[in-house]
Amino acid sequence: MRHTARLTIAHLFVPFLLLIFMPIPVRGSDAKGNYVALGFGSEACQTFLQARSNGLDLPYRHWVTGYLTAVNKLTKDTVDMRGTTDIDGMLLSLAQYCIKHPLHTFSRAVEALIKALYPKRVTAMPQ
């Protein structure tokens, strides 16, 4: 009986500890929605536009795809935030945003893109 009780406690306690210390995906920002954007996300939109006009937007493409991968992983009921929009379409949308808001950060432009893409996102893997 005593051995069974210990096993039962161990079977309940270990998963409980794992659950407590397991990272839980949530939106990471402060109460005002501020967060630190790293890499090209911290650049001004006007810097992106200049790079794009010179054919040097490849690092921004990579940054956007990495950001979208994280969004896909952390957004409930989302498999692919892009929906049917390809990377060139996304970069065109980002350029249009940045023309209107040249002093905004590139990450802020990408956030606006995500909001626009959200209704058209893929919510389940195709069968």
Give residue spans per PLM region:
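Family-specific functional hotspots in central-to-late sequence segments
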Residues: 2, 18, 25, 83, ...
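Intrinsic structural disorder/low-complexity segments
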Residues: 6, 14-15, 104
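N-terminal secretory signal peptides that target proteins for export/translocation
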Residues: 1-7
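Sec/Tat signal peptide C-region and signal peptidase I cleavage site
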Residues: 24-30
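C-terminal partner/receptor-binding element of secreted or periplasmic proteins
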Residues: 102-127
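Short N-proximal segments of mature Sec-exported proteins
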Residues: 33-96
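Bacterial N-terminal signal peptides
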Residues: 10-23
